Amino acid sequence: MAQRVRWERVERVAEAFSRLSIGEVLGFEEQVDPQYKLVSRLAGEIGAGKAALSALLVGLASYRLAMRGEEWWLCFYRHMRSSLPRAEGLRGVLRAVEGFLTSCSGAAIGREAKLRRVRRAASAAEVLGEVLDNPLVLVERPSEVLEALRVALGEKGFRKTTVFSVKIAYYAVRPLAGRKPLTLDVPIPVDVRVACASISSEMVEAPSYREVVARPEAAQRAWGRVARSSGIPVLHIDSILWVTGWAPRELPPGEAREAVAGILSRALDRGKAVLLASELVRRPCPGG
């Protein structure tokens, strides 16, 4: 079965997102997203430069994890808060990241491949050094950081982990940047949670979320339209989907809708949360 975008559903989801201001979405990340909390806390403890660079490099290896994403970033925080204060320069941060990937059980699947990927990225030394010394580059010129990583890694397009790495590093810098949003014009990184939201919202017809992860183009077109229509940058839409996208896969639709509304209500107006949940969860997310 070929995937199909249902544009009428895309417009309904976009309308629900358009009820939110960018300030509300940033506030949601700050209050609810465990990734933001851990990375920004690390930046406050050891400095934005080291926190941003280490998050950037670890983000590149954040695939095929042997633990949930929330546990992975907690493992990152605990390791880096003890190892980064002693790290000196780019080489020191790289060694700290290698130590994390070697010791954290979440990296057990393909550990050597993860280490090789991070070491290849280190060839973009000029840009990585700028992230360390002037981390605001992640807000002021994020596309340059992303392009340097792409070239260093030999990627023709942008892998989802490469885009994600810039986003997670940006979290370390945002408090310094006056809560400026990340406006990278890139396709949304489609992981399991985004794939499930694409199906459960009925924006994308597909046999399973695995099919959407393997062939993400339809989902990326749909979420790109949602971002343009709502005015919410796609990587901030991604934050909401990352926190809520597990529910349609693990719960029946009615329970999943309630769970998503409850999560959104932690930081958003209840009426807006219920409306958005009603558009995001309309059917189960099949695994295939």
From Swiss-Prot:
It catalyses: 2'-deoxyribonucleotide-(2'-deoxyribose 5'-phosphate)-2'-deoxyribonucleotide-DNA = a 3'-end 2'-deoxyribonucleotide-(2,3-dehydro-2,3-deoxyribose 5'-phosphate)-DNA + a 5'-end 5'-phospho-2'-deoxyribonucleoside-DNA + H(+). SUPFAM superfamilies: DNA-glycosylase. Its EC number is 3.2.2.-, 4.2.99.18. Signal peptide: none annotated. Residues 134-203 are annotated as: Helix-hairpin-helix. Keywords: DNA damage, DNA excision, DNA repair, Hydrolase, Lyase. GO terms for biological process: base-excision repair. The active site is at 160 (schiff-base intermediate with dna), 191. One of its GO terms (molecular function) is class I DNA-(apurinic or apyrimidinic site) endonuclease activity. 8-oxoguanine binds at residues 35, 62, 73, 164, 189, 238, 242. InterPro entries: AGOG, AGOG-like, DNA_glycosylase, HhH_base_excis_C. The keyword Nucleus does not apply. Gene3D superfamilies: Helix-hairpin-Helix base-excision DNA repair enzymes (C-terminal), Hypothetical protein, domain 2. The keyword DNA-binding does not apply. DNA repair enzyme that is part of the base excision repair (BER) pathway; protects from oxidative damage by removing the major product of DNA oxidation, 8-oxoguanine (GO), from single- and double-stranded DNA substrates. Contains two alpha-helical subdomains, with the 8-oxoguanine binding site located in a cleft at their interface. Contains a helix-hairpin-helix (HhH) structural motif and a Gly/Pro-rich sequence followed by a conserved Asp (HhH-GPD motif). Belongs to the archaeal N-glycosylase/DNA lyase (AGOG) family. This is N-glycosylase/DNA lyase. It comes from Aeropyrum pernix (strain ATCC 700893 / DSM 11879 / JCM 9820 / NBRC 100138 / K1).
